[in-house]
Regions:
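Metal-cofactor-dependent catalytic cores
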Residues: 1-158
Length: 158
């Protein structure tokens, strides 16, 4: 799907948790396509470049921004941590249950919990806080089914 940005000044309010920011619609064609695909009314939008959504300053430096991400623009997890969790589960789960942006291999289990930063090439990323344990981990992203046993969240918080 190729999306074109609407050549209009229209802005829409988009809410992520308790934060409302202005968003720019893509096009009616894109909205129709995603609505048909989902079987429900939906819209494609992108962040208004003139709008700012600040990251929680309890975990980041003042002035750091995020767009429509939950709290931070990236989520880091190690393969070793997932492998360790799967050893404790009756039915293993895939990495996509955690919707990571970066998956690191070759570490010990939970090594990433103590990292303050990582470097990929010349780019340095701050590791600011562990990810909050979220009910979304109980939803299979391929099927959209909720795990009736509450796993893997039950094991993670247990």
């Amino acid at each position: 799907l190729n999306l074109r940005v609407a050549a209009q000044e229209t802005r829409l309010a988009a809410t992520v948790w308790d934060s409302t920011v202005m968003a720019m619609p893509a096009s009616e064609e894109a909205d129709d396509w995603i609505s048909r695909y989902l079987g429900s009314s939906a819209r494609f939008v992108h962040m208004d470049p003139d709008c700012q959504r600040m990251i929680d300053t309890g975990f980041a430096r003042a002035g750091e921004e995020v767009s429509f991400a939950d709290g931070f623009p990236m989520l880091l997890i190690s393969q070793a941590s997932l492998d360790g969790l799967n050893r404790r589960l009756a039915e293993p789960v895939g990495m996509l249950r955690f919707r990571p942006s970066l998956v690191v291999a070759g570490t010990t289990e939970h090594a990433e919990d103590g990292w303050r930063s990582i470097r990929i090439g010349s780019v340095r990323f701050d590791v600011v806080k562990p990810c909050a344990r979220c009910v979304l981990t109980t939803v299979d992203p391929a099927r959209g089914d909720l795990d009736p046993s509450g796993e893997p969240l039950r094991t993670l918080i247990g």
